[in-house]
Amino acid sequence: MHPPAAGRPETIDETAAIVTARGGRGIAVRVDHTEPEQVASLFERVGELDILVNDIWGGDDLIEWGKRLWETKLEDGLLLVDRALKTHIITSHYGLPRLRTGGLVVEVTDGDGFYYRGHFFYDLVKTTVIRMAFALSQELKDRGITAVAVTPGFLRSEWMLDHFGVTEANWRDAVERVPEFIASETPLLLGRCVAALAADPLVASKNGRVFASWDLADEYGVDDADGTRPHFVRWLAANMPEVAAGMKRADDGLYAYWGEMPYRTPG
């Protein structure tokens, strides 16, 4: 079994308790999602599904920012593919047969476009996850199941708070060093956006596409834990326009090139 990514102190039991505290029923199950047998066993226990969210990452300690492919540690790059892409494939393989008609598949990525993300393996994983949602939308449409990809903005995760040496209580102290952190969001915002997608009777109209938390929050009227509604790209456009200009989101022009092959391959 792989060790916990980046040695994080948080536990699955704590996560389950948070789910229960918010009105759900959190059930902690220890599973290594790189191991097909463990994932298969998990879904045998679960039974039927209404929604499947693939959000496994585990790459914070594997990215060598500023280095090109041939300069990176190959073993770290391949491990990142195992953790952040292979896990999604394995989980979908065993989970998708259990989705009910009208169900929803959500792939969580970083960014809602196909611009270069600054590192070969990071870019490979995050753009492939978007494409996975599209491919699944094609394979699931005859079952009445919708597949989308979603991205948070500047995520104020536990790892990021530790990285900047702050907590959720005083996170604004990091803004002087990292101005764009003022537009950050907690993981709760994207979770609320996913819940809104799952409750939308017209969610099938979004099939196969990628959506950002800031756009979904505006569309569904969703706020973050503190009642604010962060809009990362809007902040960038106002304060770092040269950065925002390079973050072109996937639009109708791009999707016009995506579609099912007009023929079937032999066999």
Task: Pin down the residues of each PLM region.
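Active-site loop of short-chain dehydrogenase/reductase
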Residues: 24-25, 48-49, 98-111, 142-146
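A short, exposed helix-loop element centered on a Lys and neighboring polar residues
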Residues: 89-93, 134
